[in-house]
């Protein structure tokens, strides 16, 4: 309680300070950029040490920066609501809400228990084999379905398995989410960041796959080895499944076959439209929400109960995060990073290429990669227009800087759970099941994993681009 009060006082003091300073001194953009940076660092420190719930501090921090922006004239008071609506990515929020409802209805069928028992029997009680099964399945499916959707579908299965085994699921949730982000980076539709990049650079599904799949495939194999090393202590246990799991009748685990059939039909339709949504011009959020609405109607589900299963805290967290990053973008902090990048590389093509990879990877570990990628798109366009860069990369159909951004933003999100939508959702689901994954716990496993996988993938991607000249 004392930590909570202290944290609130600290952040409140930031707000009071900017209020007083803005009234008695002339504030310029440079001062506000510094202030915003300090507030963001304070928020990340509070999240890292879990002093206050992540949703509370992010939403409160967004409010502080929003008020400060109004006081110093960065945002006009009459445009506040328009600004907030504009910076919040409602496509992401809607996608999450729709899929959470579908997963909640699916959970009523008992299918997660059925899949869990299947996976346990297939692994024969070997936790390393079980981790491989979960990671491979998650990575492959995330190539063709948005990784947030895959996490919403698969994490409940994992939690069900390990609740039955009476073993901590945390290493497996981490491994699964890291694998999901890796797999999603391979295709145009696997990660929202790829959709943003593909739209900006006019990259089709096949071209994206041909460039990104090879480095991701090889990197995933390295990733499995790294997971074995990182979680070696947790994987030494051999589970005895000769008792309760061999005696379980799998068919009895499905509580409502009719409901399951309806869920499968709707989910298959949703996934199909996810794959073609770019071609038909319908946002993924509309598809997910439409599927959820249809499922609620045809199954006559208990709406109040289903909505209780929605992770509202995660949705509010995303909204607050989008506001925070939107303010940083409005004030020019993220654009400043782009100018610094050009200054550092001096326009040297390959130095710029690798700088984009690593700056994107490191930054995406601490700033949610969807708004970060959105901000980086105009920066990449500026870099591509640079004479030195264009003289080398201009001969290619697609600038390698787009691949660099896709690789860095996609894999960089594994560094912390804040860095990717899949990570944020995995944390939220785990917490609803009673398992708390700390920022530090994720960082210890995710950051080294991210550094090594980005390093290998960047080498392979570089060789592929050299061969394409």
Enumerate the predicted regions with their spans.
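Juxtamembrane and boundary regions of transmembrane helices in multi-pass small-molecule transporters
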Residues: 1-29, 164-170, 174, 186-187, ...
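Structural signature of hydrophobic alpha-helical transmembrane segments
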Residues: 24-38, 88-101, 143-151, 186-187, ...
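Hydrophobic alpha-helical transmembrane segments
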Residues: 37, 56-60, 93-94, 128-136, ...
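Generic alpha-helical transmembrane segments of integral inner-membrane proteins
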Residues: 37-45, 63, 67, 97, ...
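Flexible hinge motifs at transmembrane-helix junctions and intramembrane kinks/re-entrant loops
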Residues: 43-60, 257, 261, 268-289, ...
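Transmembrane alpha-helix interface/packing and boundary motifs in multi-pass membrane proteins
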Residues: 45-52, 104, 137-146, 177-189, ...
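Membrane-embedded alpha-helical segments and adjacent helix-loop junctions characteristic
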Residues: 77-168, 313-393
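Re-entrant/interfacial helical elements at transmembrane boundaries that shape
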Residues: 149-160, 173, 186-201, 335-340, ...
């Amino acid at each position: 309680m004392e930590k909570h009060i202290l944290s609130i006082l600290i952040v409140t003091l930031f707000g009071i300070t900017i209020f007083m300073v803005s009234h008695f001194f002339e504030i310029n953009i440079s001062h506000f950029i510094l202030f915003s940076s300090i507030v963001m660092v304070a928020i990340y420190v509070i999240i890292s040490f879990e002093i206050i719930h992540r949703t509370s501090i992010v939403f409160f921090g967004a409010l502080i920066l929003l008020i400060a922006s109004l006081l110093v004239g960065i945002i006009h008071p009459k445009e506040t609501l328009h600004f907030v609506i504009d910076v919040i990515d409602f496509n992401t929020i809607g996608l999450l809400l729709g899929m959470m409802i579908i997963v909640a209805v699916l959970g009523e069928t008992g299918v997660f228990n059925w899949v869990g028992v299947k996976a346990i029997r297939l692994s024969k009680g070997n936790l390393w084999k079980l981790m491989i099964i979960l990671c491979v399945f998650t990575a492959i499916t995330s190539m063709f379905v948005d990784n947030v959707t895959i996490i919403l579908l698969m994490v409940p299965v994992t939690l069900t398995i390990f609740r039955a085994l009476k073993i901590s699921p945390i290493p497996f949730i981490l491994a699964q989410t890291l694998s999901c982000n890796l797999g999603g980076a391979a295709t145009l539709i696997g990660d929202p960041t790829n959709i943003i990049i593909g739209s900006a650079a006019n990259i089709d599904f096949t071209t994206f796959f041909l460039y990104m799949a090879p480095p991701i495939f090889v990197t995933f194999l390295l990733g499995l080895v790294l997971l074995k090393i990182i979680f070696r202590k947790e994987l030494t246990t051999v589970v005895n499944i000769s008792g309760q799991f061999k005696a379980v009748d799998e068919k009895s685990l499905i509580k409502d076959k009719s409901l399951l059939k309806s869920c499968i039909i709707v989910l298959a339709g949703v996934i199909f439209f996810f794959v073609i949504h770019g071609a038909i011009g319908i946002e993924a959020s509309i598809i997910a929400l439409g599927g959820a609405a249809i499922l609620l109607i045809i199954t006559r589900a208990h709406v109040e109960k289903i909505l209780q299963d929605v992770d509202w805290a995660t949705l509010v967290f995303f909204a607050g995060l989008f506001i925070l990053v939107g303010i940083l973008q409005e004030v020019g902090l993220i654009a400043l990073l782009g100018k610094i990048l050009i200054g550092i590389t001096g326009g040297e093509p390959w130095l710029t290429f690798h700088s984009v990879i690593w700056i994107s990877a490191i930054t995406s570990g601490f700033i949610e990669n969807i708004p970060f990628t959105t901000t980086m798109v105009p920066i990449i366009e500026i870099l591509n227009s640079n004479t030195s860069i264009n003289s080398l990369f201009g001969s290619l159909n697609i600038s390698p800087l787009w691949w660099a951004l896709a690789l860095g933003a996609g894999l960089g999100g594994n560094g912390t759970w804040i860095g990717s939508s899949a990570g944020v959702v995995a944390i939220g689901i785990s917490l609803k099941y009673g398992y708390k994954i700390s920022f530090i716990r994720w960082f210890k496993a995710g950051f080294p994993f991210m550094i090594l996988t980005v390093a290998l993938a960047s080498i392979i991607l570089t060789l592929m681009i050299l061969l394409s000249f």
